[in-house]
Swiss-Prot record:
Compartments, as annotated in UniProt: Membrane
Enzyme active site: 206, 239
GO BP of this protein: secondary metabolite biosynthetic process; terpenoid biosynthetic process
Keywords for the protein's UniProt record, in alphabetical order: FAD, Flavoprotein, Glycoprotein, Membrane, Monooxygenase, Oxidoreductase, Transmembrane, Transmembrane helix
EC numbers for this chain: 1.-.-.-
Applied biotechnology uses: Eupenifeldin is a bistropolone-humulene meroterpenoid first discovered as an antitumor and anti-leukemia agent. This metabolite also shows anthelmintic activity against the parasitic worm Hemonchus contortus, anti-malarial activity as well as antifungal activity.
GN (gene name): eupB
Organism: Phoma sp
Name of this chain's protein: FAD-dependent monooxygenase eupB
Family: Belongs to the paxM FAD-dependent monooxygenase family.
UniProt cross-references to SUPFAM superfamilies, sorted A to Z: FAD-linked reductases, C-terminal domain, FAD/NAD(P)-binding domain
Amino acid sequence: MTIYTFTSSEPHIAIVGGGIVGVILTLGLLRQNVSVRLYEQSAGFREIGAGIAFTASARRCMELMDPAIIDALRRCGAVSVSDKVADEDDHLRWIDGYNQHSKAHPTYQKPLAEICGSGFQGCRRDQLLEELAKHIPSGTIMFHKRLDTIQQGKDHKMILNFVDGSSNQADAVIGCDGIKSRVRQHLFGDNHPASFPQYTHKVAYRGLVPMDRAIEILGTWKAHNFHHHVGPGAHLTHYPVANHTALNVVVFLSDETPWPDSTTMVSKGTRSEVEKALQGWHPTVLGIVNLLPDELSKWALFDQGEFPLPHYSKGRICLAGDAAHASSPHHGAGACLGVEDALCLSTLLSQVRTTLTQADEGSKDKSESSMGQLLEAAFETFNLVRRTRTQWLVNSSRRVCDLYHQQEWADPIRCPKAETCFEEIRDRSYKIWHFDVDGMLEQTRT
C-alpha cells in the first residue's frame, strides 16, 4: 500500500459520504498527495448488492485518478459488453417486451434498436466498494459519523459537527453523501426545495438471477448481453455481472400515485406486484420475472429534476455526485458522471496544493487567506465545468424513461410512432458515452 505524507501548510479536505463517488474521490486525492479524510455515517460500507456499470470514458477517468481504481473494478468481476467497437456484441439493445409477433415462435421478441455500447463494464456495487477500500490507508475513513452541522471557525477552518457529539476540522468540505445529502441541506437550508429530492413517479424492483436459470428463459446469447425490454408503462433491463455468473435484473414501473413516505425511498415489495403490473406482457419477460425472489425491495426513484441546484458550491463547501445532481437511473450513468466529478475535483485540488507549496507562504494569516481563496476558486471552477452537463443528465434520464414507457407500444396502429424514439435515445446516449475527458481537464486549467 502506498504511504502518503502531508504537511500542515497544505489543504486538508473532508469528504462526507462513503459511497462509490466518495471513495473514488478519496483515492484520487490521495494519489495527488492531497490530505483527505472520509466520514461515513454507517458502521461500514453500505452499498446494496445491485449491479452498476461504467462507460469507457468513466473508466478512463478512474485510470487518470489512480490505476488502482481500475484494478479494483477488475477484481470484483467487472464484465464488459465489449471494448471493441467492431464487436457485434458491443451494443445496448432494445426489444419489444410487450407484443408477441410470432405464434409459431412464442419466444421471439422483435428487435427495436441497437446502439454501440462503447465498452460498458458492470459489477456489483458492494463488491466494488470492498475492493476500493483495500487501497485506502488505515485512519483515512471514519465510520459512525453522521453529519449534523457545518460551521466556519475563527481560524477559517470548517468545523464538521456529528450527531455523536464529536467534531473535526478541515480546510474544505465535499459532500458526496448521496441523494439525501445533509451537506446539500446545509448549503441551501431546510426551506429551499432543492435541498430535497423529488419523486419521479417511477419505482424499481431489483434482483440478481443465476445465469444458468436466465439462459433457460432468454437463451445463451440474449442472457449474456445487455437488453432493455420496453412496453406500456414499464420496462425491464438486464445485463451480466460477476464474470457472467449472474444476471442483474431491474423492472421499472410507472406509478401515478404519490410516494407514501418521503423519509424513505424503499419499501417492501413482492414478485406478485410485478407480475400483476406486467400482466399481458411477452412470456419471455414474465419468465424472467418469475425467477426473481418472492420478496423484493421496492425502490422509489427520486431525483433533482423538479428543483435543480442553482450552484454546486458555496465558499469552502462543495457537492459532487448524487448530492449535487441525483438522477434517475435510466441512462445508467449517474455513477459515471460522479466519477467525472471526482476526476475534476481531484485535479483542481491538486492544483491548489501545488500552488500553495510553490508560493511564498508569508505569515500564517496570509497563508490561511490564500488557501481559502484558492479552495473557493477551485470549487467555483468545478461548478462552471460540471453543472450544465450533470443537470442535463437529470432531465435526459427522465425523458428516456418516458420514451420507454409510451402507451403506444400496446397499440398496433400507433406502435410505429413509438419506434421513432430511438434516434433521440441514440443522440442522448452518445452525449454521455463519448465525453471529452481531456477537454474537461483543460477547462480546469483555464
